[in-house]
Structures are given as C-alpha cells and as structure tokens.
C-alpha cells in the first residue's frame, strides 16, 4: 500500500471514529461540519471519502457491526460448543451494557435507521443472518462434542439465543442493574436447557 493510500485509510478511520462519537453525542442529525471539525479536516474531505452523509452513516454502521462481531467472536473463540455459546452471551451482554458511544450508535442505527434507510436495512439483514448462523453452528458444534444435548433442535436454540440477544440490545433504556439481572436469568435458563 502506498503512503498516500495509507494516509487516506487513516483519515477515513479517523472520520468514522469521530462520527461514532458525534452521532452518540448528538444523534444522527449531527452535522458534517461538526464531524469535520472533530477530525480536523474539511467538510469536503468527508464528501471525498464517503460521498454523502448517508454514505458516512452506512460506513459507521458497518464499522459498528465489525467491532461488535470481532469482540464477540474473540470472546467465544475457545472451548466446547456450549462454553463458546455461553461466552458469546456473556460477551454480548457486557458489550451492550457498556453504553459506550460505539454501542449507543449501534443501537440507534440497528433499531431505527435500518427501518428507515434501505441500504442500512440490507446491512442489518446480512448481519442478523451471519449472527444467527454463527449461533446455530455453535449449538451444532456443542452437539458434536457432547456438551449440548443432541435432542435439542440446534436451529431453534440458536434462533432463541439470537432473539434474546437482540432483545438485550433493545433494553438500553433500562438501568444497568436490571439488564444484568435479566441476562443472568437468561443465562441460567440457557445453561439448564443445554
């Protein structure tokens, strides 16, 4: 990669990071001017890299999904299928409860913007399919390694876990202590089920 391309990638990354912070603070109505000022670039640089505000919003959503997936996959990398599935639940719950700017933006884009913006809806559907498939595969892996009962319908369990995690994502308005109680109850139920 050339020095110029590397600099462009770095600028693009800095813009996305600044947009995440700005959208978390001001909502999706945050101005291009404010984001450009946060990064120390011109508004024209934002248009150069993303084409439009909608293009920047799409890239922020994709980056939020990449970060979430990376953290959850890393947390659930080792162990039996059962251990990995439970680690995925724990990691997701911790990340959702963190209320970091990144997760506030992920929630906002996932729950509202994706329903209003067709390009974001396509990204959301792809992410949901990938997430569901990953959870179903963890259940099947657990069935193969003997850590999850083979009598269980792997698809039903994976879909249930996915639905619960989606539910936890939407509970951001609840106090953190309440969120932790709900996650603990779900995790206990899941342990008993598996």
Predicted regions and their residues:
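Short, basic, alpha-helical segments at the C-terminal edge of helix-turn-helix-like DNA-binding modules
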Residues: 62-69
């Amino acid at each position: 990669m050339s020095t110029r391309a590397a600099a462009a990638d770095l600028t693009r990354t800095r813009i996305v990071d600044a947009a995440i912070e700005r959208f978390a603070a001001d909502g999706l109505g945050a101005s291009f001017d404010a984001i450009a000022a946060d990064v120390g670039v011109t508004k024209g640089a934002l248009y150069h890299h993303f084409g439009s505000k909608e293009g920047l919003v799409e890239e922020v959503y994709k980056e939020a999904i990449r970060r979430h997936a990376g953290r959850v996959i890393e947390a659930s990398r080792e162990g039996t299928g059962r251990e990995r599935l439970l680690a995925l639940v724990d990691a997701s719950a911790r990340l959702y409860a963190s209320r970091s700017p990144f997760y506030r933006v992920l929630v906002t884009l996932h729950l509202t913007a994706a329903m209003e913006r067709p390009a974001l809806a396509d990204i959301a559907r792809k992410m949901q399919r990938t997430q569901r498939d990953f959870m179903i595969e963890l259940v099947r892996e657990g069935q193969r390694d003997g850590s999850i009962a083979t009598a269980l319908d792997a698809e039903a369990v994976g879909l249930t876990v996915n639905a619960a995690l989606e539910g936890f994502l939407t509970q951001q308005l609840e106090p953190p202590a309440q969120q932790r109680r709900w996650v603990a109850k779900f995790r206990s139920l899941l342990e008993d089920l598996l």
